[in-house]
Amino acid sequence: MASSAQSPHFYLNPGKSNSFQSKAYKQRNVNFYWNFGIRRLFLRKSQGLSVLSSSSSSTHFSNSQLHGLCANGKLEEAMKLLNSMQELRVAVDEDVFVALVRLCEWKRAQEEGSKVYSIALSSMSSLGVELGNAFLAMFVRFGNLVDAWYVFGKMSERNLFSWNVLVGGYAKQGYFDEAMCLYHRMLWVGGVKPDVYTFPCVLRTCGGIPDLARGKEVHVHVVRYGYELDIDVVNALITMYVKCGDVKSARLLFDRMPRRDIISWNAMISGYFENGMCHEGLELFFAMRGLSVDPDLMTLTSVISACELLGDRRLGRDIHAYVITTGFAVDISVCNSLTQMYLNAGSWREAEKLFSRMERKDIVSWTTMISGYEYNFLPDKAIDTYRMMDQDSVKPDEITVAAVLSACATLGDLDTGVELHKLAIKARLISYVIVANNLINMYSKCKCIDKALDIFHNIPRKNVISWTSIIAGLRLNNRCFEALIFLRQMKMTLQPNAITLTAALAACARIGALMCGKEIHAHVLRTGVGLDDFLPNALLDMYVRCGRMNTAWSQFNSQKKDVTSWNILLTGYSERGQGSMVVELFDRMVKSRVRPDEITFISLLCGCSKSQMVRQGLMYFSKMEDYGVTPNLKHYACVVDLLGRAGELQEAHKFIQKMPVTPDPAVWGALLNACRIHHKIDLGELSAQHIFELDKKSVGYYILLCNLYADCGKWREVAKVRRMMKENGLTVDAGCSWVEVKGKVHAFLSDDKYHPQTKEINTVLEGFYEKMSEVGLTKISESSSMDETEISRDEIFCGHSERKAIAFGLINTVPGMPIWVTKNLSMCENCHDTVKFISKTVRREISVRDAEHFHHFKDGECSCGD
């Protein structure tokens, strides 16, 4: 294709005819394209070029010197000479300015280029086409569209090169609307006809928006001006159509091409892949091979990416074998793509082999492996690979640090996370929002939420992921109030996505914030965000955990149902001890042809356990493999709980001894809890011994043992367990309960003395305590005659915060209205008896969801049966 004098290639001399580009000039061995054939006459070879003597002050001589310096690429000396010429008021010729501007562009010297620009403007009222084009090309190359636009306005005359450069500059930086406006202005105001360089720029703009209607309009112009057979223009048209999703039109153009180059094939093949038509793209690739067209790097990386999207391991291996025959297997970008393909397909061992055989590894290679390990749930290997990378003296970038931080978050590896935080600060990677977001996630999962908050507040431009990370982190650290406050703050500047709202709904479910959950539901219905994703299940879970089963059923019936939807309902009824309903739901689920998973059977077994449906529970356990589910340790723990709650402790112990796998602390914990229920100290101590051999850091097992001893009156043993906890540095979360009144959630701590209605709350509770004493029921108050150790045990492991929440609800709601309370710890026996008494006395329904059960109190009875 012949190059036009008005083309946007920077190495041509715009504004002059092609005859000026002589054959001798083109063949000259000069590295600088701005040498216009003027020989380096009168060039001074002395070092004192910054000062001009009076004898050398002629304009012609000075301009010749300056032009010669530009021709030799000596920018620093050229700038010194320019400054001296300005001091002596020696005029600079326009062609010398052009040479100097092109040198600044080639050297990427933005500061010097701006200075030359200022000098030129101060000495000229307007810019000629050649100098204006030089400034345009320079500023566009620097990404400075503001000054480029100003230069464009100062030009006394413009040619096609001027328009092409500016349109291309706007398109390259993503200002597609502005680029299209310039194109139309060029046609209708500038009176300039587009050429083979104009159309690719404009078509790139249409594909970038994307705007198919404008793209078709430009296609009409291509035909009108006679460029429909130009291969570069047609390639640009194909790319535009596939970017706009019109693959059919792109293929029509492709099939009509009289001649195709590798760019044509790549545009069509990658276009199929970008539009999710991987099989069609692969068919075209095989057709290309059949025509003996050799692929290039772009072809192969695109095809490998398609195999990755398809998850087809066999096809991926075939493509890998073909790549080896092409000789591109040693190319690092191809190796990186193959590694990514294997990792995404779950074939991490094959990725390891390929990675180990790579002769040279760049930062992308290491980051791909680290991210791939994390993707395949191998965070240990991800961190080990990072250590290897460090030993190989490869400096991580922001993507690497983010990937390793994600692995640290999965493992709860705070030490490595802090190390990476320091590295990010030192390497100035902390300014990348992806690093900050992953630091928030890491600190949140390592229970350092205050550190996560510090990082969040220091992010100058928070994106949706930043807000989502901190909201999820606050929820994870049981600071649900703050999570919901952050959601409201986020809505002032950004729209939450489905993941954000899912985290917020989990916070609502945790503290029983029904009204806030309903607000989120209304937002979802109004905006439609996440309706086809996992958000409906999050809404269902929120209603179930807030105790609104009728609303939960309405949500369940209105949404697309998957195994997670059924599991949420099963868990909800299981927590309420409604085993018959759990069994009925399971049967309906199977009849609906939804395949149960391991979580389904956990809920099913727990439901049978709490309803003492031993026979049915054992039957379902024996049939698990019929549904393709292999029992794991959680299921074995459920069976132990099933037998233990029913009083069959010896059978439960024998079941543990016959397990085909080694029991974990959860299995022994289920037996310990059964011993607590039935006051069996010997077997309980045996269970605790096995637990503490395996796990000395889980506070819940210490609480179970304490409760076993306390229920049997062994207060010295309670004190011993308390000392063990202290020696191991274990603490119990403070008791906290939440109650929603008039759409607002109120929190109550066990030792809360600062609530504005504390006096009224205490008065109400004391009234109930007096009535309980009158009928011979025990109570917990400061005047209790109970052993101090027992009082301490109840205060620590329960806190009685639900009593304050219930009293607050009674004070601030009308008689007869149900009260819903959520608690972070388990209810103690005394609180359970107290709430039963209150429900009977005030004739109200009171629901309390604690850490283990859902208690529904009515007329002095509880749904749990205790």
From Swiss-Prot:
Which region ranges are annotated with the description Type DYW motif?
774-866
Checking InterPro entries in the record gives: DYW_dom, E_motif, Pentatricopeptide_rpt, PPR_At4g14850-like_plant, TPR-like_helical_dom_sf
Q: Where in the cell is it found?
A: Plastid, Chloroplast
- What do mutants without this gene show? Albino cotyledons without primary leaf and seedling lethality under autotrophic growth conditions.
Q: Where is this region: Type E(+) motif?
A: 743-773
State the similarity comment: Belongs to the PPR family. PCMP-H subfamily.
Could you identify this protein by its name?
A: Pentatricopeptide repeat-containing protein At1g15510, chloroplastic
Q: What is the lineage of its organism?
A: Eukaryota, Viridiplantae, Streptophyta, Embryophyta, Tracheophyta
Which gene does this sequence derive from?
PCMP-H73
